[in-house]
UniProtKB/Swiss-Prot annotation:
Catalyzed reactions: NAD(+) + ATP = ADP + NADP(+) + H(+)
Name listed for the protein in its UniProt record: NAD kinase 2
Broad class of the protein's primary localization: cytoplasm
Residues noted as binding NAD(+) in the record, renumbered to the chain: 81-82, 155-156, 185, 196-201, 255
PANTHER family the record matches: NAD KINASE, NAD KINASE 2
Gene Ontology molecular function, alphabetical: ATP binding; metal ion binding; NAD binding; NAD+ kinase activity
UniProt source species: Gloeobacter violaceus (strain ATCC 29082 / PCC 7421)
Active site, per annotation: 81 (proton acceptor)
GO cellular component, one term: cytoplasm
Highest taxon, organism lineage: Bacteria
Cofactor: a divalent metal cation
Entry-linked NCBIfam families: PRK02649.1 (NF002732)
EC code(s) of this entry: 2.7.1.23
Gene: nadK2
Subcellular location: Cytoplasm
């Protein structure tokens, strides 16, 4: 007897609307002959570090909940962008495509809204969709050449000082090129997907998702010569933290990650995994910039979370 196909649901259990939708979809998929596996976005949350416990994490390929594996053809994400980022971290090692439904605020990474969920699922089950691949980064922390922490990020990795501490001097090496010194409050290493997140707020450029690059953006640099840098994602990057600070904080996709001590190395490269997004309509990145961020609109206009003409 053949096993039933799998369907995954990852939802933000803090939001009642997402929890209700998860229950409705479970019944819908079961009626369609699927085995349904549920989990929350908490599985992809990296936790809150403490200086005396810097390795509070799970290895990259062990974040997924039971039932989420290569045999799962898709998973539904119910939440905002934070839930999507956490879900991507969980399922990327198994190449599971995600259909993302917004129950949050911005919804920059989501495909549809909650009031569109049932026709969206019908379209999905009919196989009428395309896949859009997004690159990720793999972040590893080494201490005395020993790996102590690792994680995936879809948006960015941020290494920054704690509040009320002085300016930092980061030594950064890209590929085999000379090490550069960056005097700043922190540095951001972002993917094209992350170019519309923290990197944008720090003065970085918007990069379309299909471009195979990474970007290095200083946070509040103390130099007129310090500018963001876009480079090929075939290059790896190593950040040496400053020696005049007891510790720094490394965070990924807005999550706490771990503390970085003097002498540690933060090594970042394009991940061998990817995030696969299910698209029910051909993606239109520039329309999304206009809708969500107000790109190209008159300065008196404000972006709305609705489709604009």
């Amino acid at each position: 007897m053949m096993a039933l196909p799998k369907a995954g649901i990852i939802f933000n259990d803090i939001k009642p609307a997402a929890a209700r939708a998860a229950a409705e979809l479970t019944e819908k998929f079961q009626d369609a002959g699927y085995r349904v596996y549920q989990t929350t976005g908490w599985g992809g949350i990296l936790g809150f570090p403490r200086p005396d416990s810097p390795v509070c994490h799970t290895p990259i390929d062990r974040l997924a909940a039971e039932g989420f594996d290569e045999a799962m053809p898709f998973a539904i994400v119910l939440g905002g962008d934070g839930t999507v980022l956490a879900a991507a971290r969980q399922v990327a090692p198994f190449d599971i495509p995600l259909l993302t439904i917004n129950t949050g605020h911005m919804g920059f990474l989501t495909e549809g809204y909650l009031n569109q969920i049932h026709p969206a699922i019908d379209t999905l089950l009919a196989g009428q969709y395309a896949l859009e691949d997004r690159s990720m980064i793999e972040v590893r922390v080494f201490r005395d050449e020993r790996l102590i922490w690792e994680a995936l990020a879809l948006n960015e990795a941020v290494l920054h000082k704690e509040p009320l501490s002085g300016i930092c001097h980061f030594e950064v090496a890209i590929g085999r090129h000379n090490i550069v010194d960056i005097a700043a409050d922190g540095v951001i290493v972002a993917t094209p997907t992350g170019s519309t997140a923290y990197a944008l707020s720090a003065g970085g450029p918007v990069i379309t998702p299909d471009v195979q690059v990474l970007q290095l953006i200083p946070i509040c640099p103390h130099s007129l010569a310090a500018r963001g840098l876009v480079f090929a994602d075939t290059e790896s990057l190593v950040v040496h933290p400053p020696t005049n600070h007891q510790h720094l904080i490394l965070s990924l996709d807005g999550n706490s990650g771990c503390y970085i001590w003097p002498g540690d190395q933060v090594r970042i490269r394009r991940a061998r995994y990817r995030t696969r997004l299910i698209r029910l309509q051909p993606p239109e990145f520039f329309a999304l910039l206009r809708e969500k961020l107000g790109w190209g609109l008159p300065h008196i206009a404000k972006p709305l979370s609705v489709e604009l003409p």
